[in-house]
Design a protein with these regions (language model features):
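Parallel beta-helix/beta-solenoid repeats that form elongated, surface-exposed shafts/blades used
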Residues: 1-198
Length: 198
């Protein structure tokens, strides 16, 4: 086991001459540390980024990045988890969480909207939105279920429920009327009323 102390850095080696640790100062003046596995491949990095924020990166034995914890380009904290191929599988950022499938398509979003309300979105394997559950523009709760084409199939809002056909036409309404009473309305595929109960 060997070590080397240089001008502004320290490096250690294993009995086979492979590097195991490097601690030093980068070109930008920030400090950093690199750890290596027994084969001399980098397994972890702790240090200062180009924009002055700190971060930690880990790597698998194929030199693919597996995690990132630190400051992002928006100067906020973030955590990224990667699959064994180095593709993003999870992201936790400033007020939200995202998950990705093996093809790199987003499958889940959980977070805070621009209006300050929370919501959850799910996506199919092609990245097409399938469900929205959260706060609507009027600050009430709502749920939308989308069909394969991305059109709203079902909508559940504050005091009402609606269904839609593949053409985006409303086929059913169950809920409250303007007078405060409840009613049920069904429509044909052209959204022409076929029955009314209320």
């Amino acid at each position: 086991i060997m070590g080397y102390l240089g001008n502004g850095y320290m490096q250690t080696y294993n009995q086979y001459g492979e590097p195991t640790l490097f601690i030093g100062t980068g070109k930008d003046g920030g400090g950093y540390m690199r750890a290596y596995n027994g084969n001399g491949d980098e397994s972890a990095y702790v240090g200062t980024g180009r924009m002055g924020g700190g971060y930690i990166r880990t790597y698998n034995n194929s030199q693919k990045e597996t995690s990132y914890l630190g400051t992002g380009s928006d100067h906020a904290g973030q955590l990224r988890i990667y699959n064994k191929e180095g593709e993003t599988s999870s992201y936790l950022g400033e007020g939200y969480y995202q998950a990705y499938n093996q093809f790199g398509e987003r499958t889940l979003f959980l977070g805070t909207g621009t209006s300050g309300g929370g919501y959850l979105r799910t996506y199919n394997f092609n990245g097409q939105e399938t469900i929205y559950l959260g706060t609507g523009a009027d600050s009430s709760g709502q749920m939308r279920v989308y069909d394969a084409a991305g059109e709203t199939g079902t909508f559940l809002g504050s005091g009402y429920f609606r269904t839609y056909n593949q053409f985006g036409k409303m086929t059913t309404y169950l809920g409250n009327g303007k007078d405060g009473g409840g009613y049920l309305r069904t429509n044909n595929k052209f959204e022409t009323e076929t029955s009314f109960l209320g």
